[in-house]
Amino acid sequence: MEGFFWKTLLVVGALTISGTSSFPHKPLTYEEAVDLAVSVYNSKSGEDSLYRLLEAVPALKWDALSESNQELNFSVKETVCQMAEERSLEECDFQEAGAVMGCTGYYFFGESPPVLVLTCKSVGNEEEQKQEEGNEEEKEVEKEEKEEDQKDQPKRVKRFKKFFKKLKNSVKKRAKKFFKKPKVIGVTFPF
């Protein structure tokens, strides 16, 4: 009978230990995860100004207890506070014409320690940029036409100059877009 007691005690102890849940990471709500991602962006981006949350896209499938990868999307805007000031973000107002960054973050909770990969890129108003570029091109073309009219050049030379000027402007635009790369930040942190 004594052997039966010890076997029963061993089984009950094993079930008790296996029944308790211990998470390898601290469960995060979506809001906490976004706040942490904004904090990581401010500390790792290398920007002079602090950025504050502008908008967080609600997560439909966020599971605070999940061990799988979790995605979050949000945008941040440049504030009047400088990084060196070490002020709370709540004290910092947005800059009037501050830069807006669209960010996508992925938490990898299955890793030990958990990993956050954050990708942010500028989301300035593309329509305004296109209009400004178009206005600049029109001004340049008008200026060139005036200069060409003043000179007595054959029409063929004028057409070539106009063509190569358009080509040059096109290359400039594409170079600007190419070198406007998003920032990618990866960090690990213990929970």
From Swiss-Prot:
Disulfide bonds join 81-92, 103-120. GO terms for biological process: defense response to bacterium; defense response to fungus; innate immune response; killing of cells of another organism. GO terms for cellular component: extracellular space; membrane; other organism cell membrane. It comes from the Eukaryota. Expressed by the venom gland. Potent antimicrobial peptide against most of Gram-negative bacteria, some Gram-positive bacteria (Bacillus) and some fungi. Adopts an amphipathic alpha helical conformation, that may allow to partition into the target membrane. No hemolytic and cytotoxic activities have been observed on mammalian cells. This is Cathelicidin-related antimicrobial peptide Na_CRAMP.
